[in-house]
């Protein structure tokens, strides 16, 4: 029995309501929100792989007492971490360089989740909308935090109706539903982008496998069917997996991280621009008062 069949198998076959487990709860017919899926198995595998990776990195780091003793593994990972640190400092400023470990972990987590499908029989966790929405929610919370941190009350004024008096714009503090809806756009955009791209690759690979199963199952000569299936699978399947799992998986992880950088940097830059404009305004008033 494959891992997919093991995970998707119902954990409780008893029909009596009194003996039902939490996995059998079905608010809507055909939908069991608490039933484990193969994406859950994929998340657990990614957790174990990343935990093993960092433990191994820590052990290797302790043994490396000089640059000469550093292995290629340590050098590559340190180069990746330095790149993330520099990117964080360039886009978010030196004061936010402390967020570099988060972006590094986010990149490794998404890429690992995309590559877990190479193990066979396991759908990538990123093919689940719940998973990508959770990642998007973390990015969205960061947007709000960065907006409040750098823009203060001006962040909330963006979601209210404004009026212009003598060329100056003032906030009415009356909520603007369209601005509020647009404020949630990054959450849905970044979540659906990752989910849609990975799900599309998963569906294409599934259709490809089922297509060849259908073709070769019609051959009465079983040894011939197995031989042809092996040849076609060996020639074509690796190419598709390299593109949809490896290339697309790494690319989508990179895109997600860079979009998170962009959203956070936008909040910071808008706040700095407003603060600079306010400082120039007050300096101008002070100069005028001194000259009067």
Swiss-Prot record:
This protein's UniProt keywords: ATP synthesis, Cell membrane, CF(0), Hydrogen ion transport, Ion transport, Membrane, Transmembrane, Transmembrane helix, Transport
Compartments in which it is found: Cell membrane
PROSITE patterns in UniProt: ATPASE_A (PS00449)
Signal peptide: none
Coiled coil: none
Any Pfam family hit: ATP-synt_A
CC terms in the record's Gene Ontology section: plasma membrane; proton-transporting ATP synthase complex
GO molecular function terms listed in the Swiss-Prot or TrEMBL record: proton-transporting ATP synthase activity, rotational mechanism
Highest taxon of the lineage: Bacteria
InterPro entries with a match to the protein in the record: ATP_syn_F0_a_bact/chloroplast, ATP_synth_F0_asu, ATP_synth_F0_asu_AS, F0_ATP_A_sf
Residue ranges crossing the lipid bilayer per the database entry: 39-59, 73-93, 102-122, 128-148, 172-192, 196-216, 231-251
A GO BP annotation: proton motive force-driven plasma membrane ATP synthesis
Subunit (UniProt): F-type ATPases have 2 components, CF(1) - the catalytic core - and CF(0) - the membrane proton channel. CF(1) has five subunits: alpha(3), beta(3), gamma(1), delta(1), epsilon(1). CF(0) has three main subunits: a(1), b(2) and c(9-12). The alpha and beta chains form an alternating ring which encloses part of the gamma chain. CF(1) is attached to CF(0) by a central stalk formed by the gamma and epsilon chains, while a peripheral stalk is formed by the delta and b chains.
Function, in words: Key component of the proton channel; it plays a direct role in the translocation of protons across the membrane.
Family to which this protein belongs: Belongs to the ATPase A chain family.
NCBIfam families named in the record: PRK05815.3-3
Protein name: ATP synthase subunit a
